[in-house]
Amino acid sequence: SFSCLAAIAGEVSFKITKQYLNFPISHKENRGRMTFEVNGKPDLSVVIRLAPDEAEYWVFKDVSAFKGKTIKITYDGNEKGLSKIYQSDEIEGQAELYKEKNRPQFHFTTRRGWINDPNGLIYYEGEYHLFYQHNPFERDWENMHWGHAVSKDLIHWTELPDALYPDHLGTMFSGSAV
């Protein structure tokens, strides 16, 4: 259900009541800068191809840590897509995840977005940990986060929340130090 507090040109605000914000993506659009503020404090800034009309696919941001707070999103791209962002306790298209045509079934893939460069491959307390570069906001290179997944057998993987996010110093590339 759509639960938006306010939408004006280039920005929209949500009082967070659900786990995810879902975003429509179209590669016909140029990337625009999207900035998230939580209760007036900067949280994240990414570039994204927000679909003003029909989405080619959807991406999401887990906002469960912000329940009860207000998130303001500003966007300098085609602002028509802002009205299509919505909250839900499910990822848009969740029923079809891992069933998509051409989706690898043996190797790890993320639910949404682009992945590259496995990093920090470790075995710890009975689980294999895979960290990798991740753009959770589209299927091309950009917005470097470090994704995280775990497995007990190196075949069946559970995707965890991203471990590292872009911050005021920049994005999280391979070779970044913590």
Task: Indicate where each model-derived feature is located.
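Carbohydrate-active catalytic/glycan-binding domains of CAZyme proteins
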Residues: 8-178
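Bacterial N-terminal signal peptides
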Residues: 1-3
